[in-house]
From Swiss-Prot:
Modified residues (Phosphothreonine): T315
Domain of life assignment: Eukaryota
Source species: Rattus norvegicus
Family according to the record: Belongs to the ANKRD34 family.
UniProt protein name: Ankyrin repeat domain-containing protein 34A
ANK repeats: 4-33, 37-72, 76-106, 110-139
UniProt modified residues of type N5-methylglutamine: Q15
Keyword terms, alphabetized: ANK repeat, Methylation, Phosphoprotein, Repeat
Length: 495
């Protein structure tokens, strides 16, 4: 069978052949190489049984000098120090391993350290060496006790002895067993065999109880006895809290505390308890930004709702107007007559005004209807028949105290159009009014325009009404005015 160098090194170390192991290491073998179980050459040297104990110490020293690591663990978690303690390597081998950095506090997968393995082996010298190493590293002294399990096997336990806290008084003096070990020489080792077999079972139980140390839990000196009831701390009333930006449903009045029902009969006490569970009345919450609820509407809402139905613009059919009440119809006709009774408009009693109002109603019923091509109408009628024009129905929305003035040149164009019956229909009762002189003056001054006639006395309420101007002049009126100025020039080529 062919063996690799690692396995050859393990076989050479296991058989105690130091010279062969030296040749293998000098030939390039790795000192920390392990087999399938994770066992290294150093572990094999600690477990081996040599005829001469000095050969084991010499082999371990040589491997450590070649760089072997004493803290490498195998598949079971055991190190070379554990193998030395369990295999009876002796105190010399343990000292060599500890001198090269072996840790005595490391535990294997079963939870046993090198101290436990040394105690199971019963090697006092090795155990003392391990305790000295723990003390040199500043580790607390470890107390180990051996106990027999109910099945009859030995079971070793390891405890960490910590000094008692200050202020704790022992009620009874401690037994002469080693409570706190000051040196390894004071540690008493006891195993399951030996003198225990000569004692009675009851004496063995007492001795086992004495070996296992029990550390009482610290108690405060002013700790009251369990028979005395603990006084309840005083409960302070809860502080009133102030809600900031809370929800409306959280603004509920806190329930009033119910007085104690002591001294009352059974039924009254039960009724008081049930009454304490009822919720108190909630305050009425005011609604903001909501149209629901029985609250009174604001005064401006009464003014809005108090008015009549709103008229539609350019889409109101004539049938709807005929279906209005007689009182509302008279009011609307009065408002229309007041609007039409402005400077440049007809009198409400004239036949021309009634004919014009009928034409306005017919053309304003639909924004897309236009007069026939053969009919001749005035510019004002053609303007109001357009979709963008304002129908007389839309004028009813305005207050009767506000009158409109559509342009600054309206009166002048009306007077000019009165003298040209072939261009526009007559708008005045007088058939032949004089043509105003609109030619430019020789001095360069602008021609003076006639002032609009007053429709009433200075003190009449009609003259005090406010005139609303939408725009100064319309494009059609400006074009007509420019044409008349060219016709009324000094040469008068058009005549």
């Amino acid at each position: 069978m062919l063996h690799t160098e690692g396995h050859a090194l393990l076989r050479a170390v296991g058989q105690g052949k130091l010279r062969l192991a030296r040749l293998l290491l000098e030939g390039g073998a790795y000192v920390n190489e392990g087999d399938a179980q994770g066992e290294t050459a150093l572990m094999a040297a600690c477990r081996a049984r040599y005829d001469d104990p000095q050969n084991k110490a010499r082999m371990v020293r040589y491997l450590l000098e070649q760089g072997a690591d004493p803290n490498i663990a195998d598949r079971l978690g055991r190190t070379a120090l554990m193998h030395a303690c369990a295999g009876g390597g002796g105190a010399a081998v343990a000292s060599l391993l500890l001198a090269h950095g072996a840790d005595p506090s490391v535990r294997d997968h079963a939870g046993a350290s090198a101290l436990v393995h040394a105690l199971d082996r019963g090697d006092r010298e090795t155990l003392a060496t391990l305790l000295d190493a723990c003390k040199a590293k500043g580790t607390e002294v470890i107390i180990i006790t051996t106990d027999t399990s109910p099945s009859g096997t030995k079971k070793t336990r390891q405890y960490l002895n910590s000094p008692p806290s200050p202020g704790v008084e022992d009620p009874a003096p401690a037994p002469p067993s080693p409570g706190v070990c000051t040196s390894p020489s004071e540690v008493q080792l006891q195993t399951a065999g030996g003198g225990r077999g000569l004692l009675s079972p009851r004496a063995q139980e007492e001795e086992e109880k004495r070996d296992v140390f029990e550390f009482p839990l610290p108690k405060s000196p002013d700790d009251p006895s369990p028979s005395e009831p603990l006084p309840k701390p005083p409960r302070h009333p809860p502080k009133p809290l102030k809600r900031l930006n809370s929800e409306p449903w959280g603004l509920v009045a806190p329930p009033q505390p119910v007085p104690p029902a002591e001294g009352r009969p059974g039924l009254e006490r039960l009724a008081a308890e049930f009454n304490g569970l009822t919720l108190t009345g909630r305050p009425r919450l005011s609604r903001r930004h909501s149209t629901e609820g029985p609250e009174d509407p604001p005064p401006w809402a009464e003014k809005v709702t108090g008015g009549g139905p709103l008229s539609r613009r350019n889409t109101a059919p004539e049938a709807q107007e005929s279906g209005l009440p007689s009182g509302l119809r008279q009011k609307l006709s009065r408002m229309e007559s007041v609007e039409l009774d402005t400077p440049g408009h007809f009198c409400p009693d004239s036949p021309e005004s009634s004919r014009l109002s009928l034409e306005r109603r017919r053309y304003s019923a639909s924004p897309l209807t236009l007069p026939p091509a053969g009919s001749v109408s005035s510019p004002r009628q053609s303007q109001e028949s357009l979709p963008g024009a304002v129908s007389p129905l839309s004028g009813r929305r305005r207050s009767p105290g506000l009158l409109e003035r559509r342009g600054s040149g309206t009166l002048l164009l009306d007077h000019i159009s009165q003298t040209r019956p072939g261009f526009l229909p007559p708008l005045n009762v007088s058939p032949h009014p004089p043509i105003p002189d609109i030619r430019p003056q020789p001095g360069g001054r602008a021609p003076s325009l006639p002032a609009p006639p007053h429709s009433g006395a200075p003190g009449s309420p009609r003259t005090k009404r406010k005139l609303v101007r939408r725009h100064s002049m319309q494009t059609e009126q400006i074009r007509l005015l420019g044409g008349f100025q060219s016709l009324g020039g000094p040469g008068e080529p058009g005549r």
